[in-house]
Amino acid sequence: KTTAPSVYPLAPVCGDTTGSSVTLGCLVKGYFPEPVTLTWNSGSLSSGVHTFPAVLQSDLYTLSSSVTVTSSTWPSQSITCNVAHPASSTKVDKKIEPRGPTIKPCPPCKCPAPNLLGGPSVFIFPPKIKDVLMISLSPIVTCVVVDVSEDDPDVQISWFVNNVEVHTAQTQTHREDYNSTLRVVSALPIQHQDWMSGKEFKCKVNNKDLPAPIERTISKPKGSVRAPQVYVLPPPEEEMTKKQVTLTCMVTDFMPEDIYVEWTNNGKTELNYKNTEPVLDSDGSYFMYSKLRVEKKNWVERNSYSCSVVHEGLHNHHTTKSFSRTPGLDLDDVCAEAQDGELDGLWTTITIFISLFLLSVCYSASVTLFKVKWIFSSVVELKQTISPDYRNMIGQGA
């Protein structure tokens, strides 16, 4: 149900301030749904502004913002909190007025910052997909509490698995230098099968600055499972003139989108690779690319590179595609081999032609010689046959 917000200006309680700066606040309470926009002086005042994340309580949101200005700026100049809630078409402008008469305060009086509702914010993060799907690794669910005041650093964090409290989490506190607040990180080791079976993990946080404990829950999303198709692609020929070349791993047709891709070189993990985020395809599945930059000489020397993919749809949740430079891919070598082959074929053709030519010449000469000899023999015989016998003719005449 749409509910318009109530807006409350927050001012220091001591009248005039003795310090060089003063912090003012604006509380936006009891609205639904999100979002609201909050600006100071219609956006012209942006320096020193800190807007806290919205907090959901009893199905209504509460948001607060503070702005720090110099004592000479306020209250001598007007400062207004501008709130807009599009869902309810609400716009509210609240001018920050001094509380009480502006009298000279007692010397010990020091104005505290307004007690803004919001305080710490809580976030929960799932385990890394590789840690969940590889039995040799340990998955961890993480709860992070930010913007914890140094004045109230005590944060109580409780963990529940399917609403059963567990006590195996490890919690550490870190100081944030950029805004002088504390960050509390609680890590809960979990069982692989608990996450894969869809159990619910809940982080419950309490602190003095919180009006009520904040709970955050997380579990494995439900949905269809489809194993990815993995393809590895060598560098394009146009890139072989450069010092570095690109190897590509294309992963397609997988569901859900949680996936882990890495590269190895002869069994050693490579670091110089980049993965795209999974992209939703038209059929509801996902695809992604991973590229690895390597030195060309390493590729030319035929080092073996592998693209490893971890996904719940795969057999044993893991597959690896390996490849290296294939012999004979060098264009110069291919051309040289082709040229040598063409020359060999040409010499063979020439040799056969010459042999056949010489054989033909020899055959023609032999046939011609035989014919000449036969004709000559025939002429001689014929001449002997028809020659007159002069001796008989002389004898008859006598």
Curated annotation (Swiss-Prot):
Glycans are attached at N179. GO terms for molecular function: antigen binding. Its main location: membrane. It is found in: Cell membrane. The chain crosses the membrane at residues 345-362. One of its GO terms (biological process) is endosome to lysosome transport. One of its GO terms (cellular component) is immunoglobulin complex, circulating. The gene is Ighg2a. The keyword Transcription does not apply. This is Immunoglobulin heavy constant gamma 2A. Keywords: Cell membrane, Disulfide bond, Glycoprotein, Immunoglobulin domain, Membrane, Repeat, Transmembrane, Transmembrane helix. InterPro entries: Ig-like_dom, Ig-like_dom_sf, Ig-like_fold, Ig/MHC_CS, Ig_C1-set, Immune_Resp_Modulators. Residues 5-97, 120-219, 228-324 form the Ig-like domain. It is a single-pass membrane protein. Pfam families: C1-set. Disulfide bonds join C26-C81, C143-C203, C249-C307. Residues 363-398 are cytoplasmic. It comes from the Eukaryota.
